[in-house]
Amino acid sequence: MRGFDGYAPSGVVMKRVLVVGAGLHGLVTAAREHIAKNQVFVVEKRKRIGGRGTSQESFGHQLEHGPHLLLKGGELHSMVKKVSKVKPSLRPVRPSKIFVVGHGPLYPINNPKELLNVKMGKDKVREDALRLISGWGQDIPERRNALIKGKLCVVGEGWSGLVGRLASTLEEVGIPIQTGVKITDSYEGGVITSKGVKIEADVVKMCTGEPVGEAVKVSTLDVVLDNRPLKGLHGLVKDDVAILDLAAIHSVKAPGMSHFSCIALSGGVSKIEDLLDERVSGWRSHIITRRENNSITLTDSRGLLSDGMI
């Protein structure tokens, strides 16, 4: 790890900055405050850092909370590259290898007429599918364009690997991260924990993941199969359900197998299972491991994804 010392502006007065929350947003905020030559301290109410960027190991596979695609060249990618000696291993999702059920390839490069309709915005089904894959239903033009240009990527080490890189670098430069600390109140000059302990700070950054306005909930399913029924396809889309085969996109993900990372904007996990039943016959008999969330926060009224909140 290279640390942050080479990126700080000169002539800046040091402040005591407390970052509340050690998810992706909190860790990046802590890194930026250190770059600004401030004294930084991080607290997290849970026993584990990472927030929704955590993973669960099962039978040698890392299962996350549904699919995560990193915007290559975006702010998060740039920050991770700054603090790491080794660049994260990225492989792009190819929209030409995603099949829209009843419609064909998401980006029909071998059909000039259909491709022209997509480019002119005259194909609503594919337009909705592009929005689903690029922004999980959120309208984020930058990510839509990135998907078409091969700049929305699966991360070899997973989202949790990016969290780990940031946390390791913070530790290396001496920024303490204390878990199991719940903040219950604030006062002029700091905050108070649930145990009545006062923590003094000039600036408090709240990065707890609390939604702004109304939370947008989705359902996710991650499942590893011992076969490859999609035969190299990167994914499937039907209505508001998307299935990505991470193993087909990135070679380090379940080699020789399938790692389906799935999301449904409505209808729950059963909606995902219905699509798998329809298009991947017999998948249940090939399950190695699975992880599901019937309701998990995707975003809030801001419409930003996790790597867009930093």
Would you name each region that the model predicts?
Residues 1-17, 36:
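Extreme N-terminal leader/targeting segments of oxidoreductases
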Residues 15-42:
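N-terminal Rossmann-like FAD-binding beta1-loop-alpha1 element of flavoenzymes
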Residues 103-189:
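Active-site/ligand-binding neighborhood in enzyme catalytic cores
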Residues 182-275, 279:
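Mid-domain catalytic core of redox enzymes
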